[in-house]
Amino acid sequence: MKKLKIEIDEMDVDHQNQWTANDLADMLTHQNHSQLNQNERLTFLYPAVDHTLVKVPSSLSASDKSSWIETQNVNPFQCKYTESPRTLYNRDDDVGSIRTSDPIPSECGIYYFEMCVLNDGEDGAVSIGLTSKGTNLNHQPGWDRHTWGYHGDDGNFFKEDGGYGKKYGPVYGKDDVVGCGLNLISRSCFFTKNGKFLGVAVRNLPVIEYYPTIGVHSKDECVEVNLGQKPFLYNIAMEKILYNAHQKDMAKKTS
């Protein structure tokens, strides 16, 4: 821990956000503050946000969702596909997608959320990504304009495109934890699988409001979304540190 503290002091990262060297050392060792409640964790991860005035996504919307998805009463972070009366998975308009109640504040800098696939159903047609307000929630994230998504059945990334997407990462399914990160500074998006960074999926994102979004599209598919109510599997705090350090290093090289 002492060595990490010295390294962080030398990096001189994120003093503007009032993180102490000990705080940052804890993050680097992935001691993800499991004792914190959701509000405390979100405040810790996004210290530049005035949490008394601005909401960071902390819940799934009760209304901004497809009719083909339902949240569970016992656990409001769990979502399940509601079986369509039509032949499943051969139609493009009976996807069950859901957004968070609030958009991602720009002050977050780098925002992150995860989902755990509890059941990948008949087809494994689960997705995670970002959408803007008003986009079609009967479609998967990534199929329409101002939507982006990483899909579990083929591992492809979809960028505002209803086609086949592009090869991005591994497929994922039952018991996998998949995360989505939005870098509001570089206007880029990345994903993780089981705590491992998969790389940047898209750059030069438009300046709009982004909502964390997940989609399900076959019988019995069920996921649990993590919006900071518990520790993330991926160490997003370290990602923020490394990004800030890289930015400062680049600034020194160009000055």
Model-derived segments and their meaning:
Residues M1-S255:
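PRY/SPRY (B30.2) beta-sandwich protein-interaction domains
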